[in-house]
Amino acid sequence: MFKPTRILSILVVSCLLVSAAVAQKGRDKIEIVKPKVYVAPLLETSPNLQAILDKAVSDVMTAGKFKPGEMAATVIDVRDPAKWATASFEGERQLYTASVVKMFYMAALERQLEDGKVTMTKELERGLKDMIVDSSNEATQYILDVLTDTSSGSELPQKQFEAWQYKRNRVNRFFSSLGYTNINVNQKTFCEDAYGIEQQSRKYKGQNRNMLTTNATARLLAEIATRRFVNEIRSNAMLGLMSRDWTTTDKDPNSQSVNFTGKALIDNKMTGAKLWSKAGWTSKARHDAAYIETTDGQKVVIVVFTENHANEFEHVPAVAAKVLNALKESK
């Protein structure tokens, strides 16, 4: 016979297990969860692609008088769906994201929409469009609130702040579950500065700012472009928002269509080429993440991040142009 204390112990353990299961189920309702069928892409370094990228970066860094650590770049050729050829320069170096992080928030939101954990509304649709098409910081703040069930406000006592920060890290946990490493995607973007709990979350001196690598950024864009991150309908919706008409006569120096990688297509006279991208710029950073399809069959992701050369608009498109030219010549 079981002793009363033994029976009580069994009941307590059973209750704890049930509670844990219920809690996990509850978390799954709000967490951004990796699909059971998800398989991370297979990437293999290509010596030819590496030589092309190394020369392009070296030429631009020399001409632009870059210091070590001021540029990173990654290229992925996605023509073979079974195995992507890749090359990188400082591809695992963490750099401040600028607005490129908005692509990560878009992808996370589409995951939640596909899973039925978030419902699309006209306001959410407006925010998503403005975040990607116009790179609106205010729209990004709203999207991150929706994704993490957090909101800006005053600083909080430590225990309350830790609970808030755990929720704010929801997007980080999602990408970590997919095998993304060395990134931090948990902060809002601002035109000026963060205040209150947003500054508290940044640890006041920016130690917890958004950070990305060109490797992680290129991987995500490649997964979106090949329609493997979410279903085809949602993938096409993301690509629709990132589509850039590089043949337009936009005079904005920060135009995501005719500057950044778009300028490379203009300079190379790449008639018929298609461009999808998300750029980012601040007073110190100038980045672009671009996917290009050309009439001769190229399907390539090119991501270039630069720091301390934000007012020198020529460097990002120069790297892209050199890579695209070399790829054409090596066919």
Q: How should these model regions be labeled?
A:
Residues 1-9:
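Bacterial N-terminal signal peptides that target proteins for export
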Residues 52-90, 292-293:
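A short, well-structured edge-of-sheet supersecondary motif
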Residues 19-23:
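Sec/Tat signal peptide C-region and signal peptidase I cleavage site
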Residues 37-52, 56-60, 68, 123-204, ...:
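Active-site-adjacent helix/loop patches that line small-molecule binding or acyl-intermediate pockets
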Residues 9-18:
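Bacterial N-terminal signal peptides
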Residues 24-57, 65-67, 209, 213, ...:
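Structured C-terminal helix/loop/strand segments within mature extracytoplasmic catalytic/sensor domains
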Residues 111-129, 140, 231-235:
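Short, well-structured active-site flanking segments
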Residues 95-118, 131, 302:
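Active-site SXXK
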